[in-house]
């Protein structure tokens, strides 16, 4: 599900921004890192991959 979050953020906001969450914020750190792995991906591409993944998960 982190992949869905990252694709959504990349599609709606673009490349990751802000500081990485603190060491003990495990959820925040995981989200930040997942989003960061998509750096440079176009918003339209991220949105399409999001839709494709949702369709795959629903089937």
Walk through the language-model features, giving the residues of each.
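A charge-rich, low-complexity, intrinsically flexible signal that marks solvent-exposed coils, linkers
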Residues: 1-23, 29-59
């Amino acid at each position: 599900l982190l992949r869905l979050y990252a694709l959504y953020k990349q599609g709606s906001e673009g490349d990751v921004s802000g500081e990485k969450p603190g060491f003990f914020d495990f959820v925040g750190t995981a989200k930040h890192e997942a989003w960061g792995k998509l750096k440079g991906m176009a918003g339209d591409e991220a949105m399409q991959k999001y839709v494709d993944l949702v369709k795959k998960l629903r089937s």
